[in-house]
Regions:
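His/Met- and acidic-residue-enriched segments that coordinate or traffic transition-metal cofactors
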Residues: 1-2, 7
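Acidic/histidine-rich alpha-helical segments that form the ligand environment
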Residues: 1, 55-95, 99-122
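Short secondary-structure junctions and interdomain/linker hinges
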Residues: 7-10, 85
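Short, contiguous alpha-helical
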Residues: 9-54, 93-149
């Protein structure tokens, strides 16, 4: 939320170099990714379409407040889901092959952290000084690529 709240409405529409996507898409997707694990648990499927839907769905969140409210909602859903630890062992079909919900949520967390790292990399390009970017020690136990890109 701290990163999202540093941006103006105009900066949410800023398009990143290399892989063109808006900051709105990048940051909303960071919140959205863990819920895909919950949906995979419920449906038994984890598809490429699920992974790509953020490209359009993020457009429904126009302000930083909208994005943060969505993040709050997802955090609550994930906390409730994780109260039932037995759900994590369920194997689901995915475009990567069979995978447990635990592995999906762990991948989602690493993916979200990686996108937050991307956002902080892009901030100076928009004239924004990152406010207390996430320290690598905070996610030392999460599988996050060493390379930024």
């Amino acid at each position: 939320r701290r990163a999202v709240n540093q941006l103006s409405p105009e900066q949410l529409d800023w398009i990143s170099p290399g892989r063109p996507r808006s900051m709105r898409q990048l940051l909303w997707h960071s919140f959205e990714r863990p819920v895909l694990g919950i949906e995979a648990y419920e449906s038994g499927q984890y598809t490429e379409q699920m992974v790509r839907r953020y490209e359009e769905l993020a457009q429904n969140y126009r302000t930083t407040s909208d994005i943060c409210a969505y993040g709050d909602k997802i955090e609550e859903e994930l906390a409730e889901f994780l109260k039932h630890g037995d759900r994590l062992a369920k194997k689901v079909e995915s475009y990567m092959g069979p995978i447990t919900v635990h592995e999906l949520i762990e991948l989602a967390l690493g993916h979200a952290i990686q996108h937050l790292r991307h956002a902080y990399h892009y901030f100076p390009m928009m004239g924004v000084e990152p406010d207390r970017p996430l320290d690598p020690k905070a996610y030392a136990d999460v599988p996050v690529p060493e390379d930024l890109f």
